[in-house]
UniProtKB/Swiss-Prot annotation:
It comes from the Bacteria. InterPro entries: UPF0270 (IPR010648), YehU-like_sf (IPR036685). This is UPF0270 protein plu0398. Belongs to the UPF0270 family. Transmembrane segments: none annotated.
Length: 72
């Protein structure tokens, strides 16, 4: 199920994004980014609609996925 990120409390959204960034360990190449930069990057992707928050009933967890990977 898609979760509209705009409906979340700002602190909840921040916690979800931080958890995702720390869990994924995204590779940014030679220029390592700070946690704040990575969080801002994911937030911008949410705002642009490039990624979305998805609730998995099977895993009882929220994940951030590229919109192309989610088939509604």
């Amino acid at each position: 199920m898609i979760i509209p990120w705009q409906q979340l409390e700002p602190e909840t959204l921040l916690n979800l994004i931080e958890s995702f960034v720390l869990r994924e360990g995204t590779d940014y190449g030679e220029d390592e980014k700070s946690l704040e930069q990575k969080v801002a990057n994911i937030r911008h992707q949410l705002e642009r609609g490039d990624v979305m928050l998805v609730w998995s009933e099977l895993h009882e967890s929220v994940n951030i996925v590229p919109k192309e990977m989610f088939h509604s």
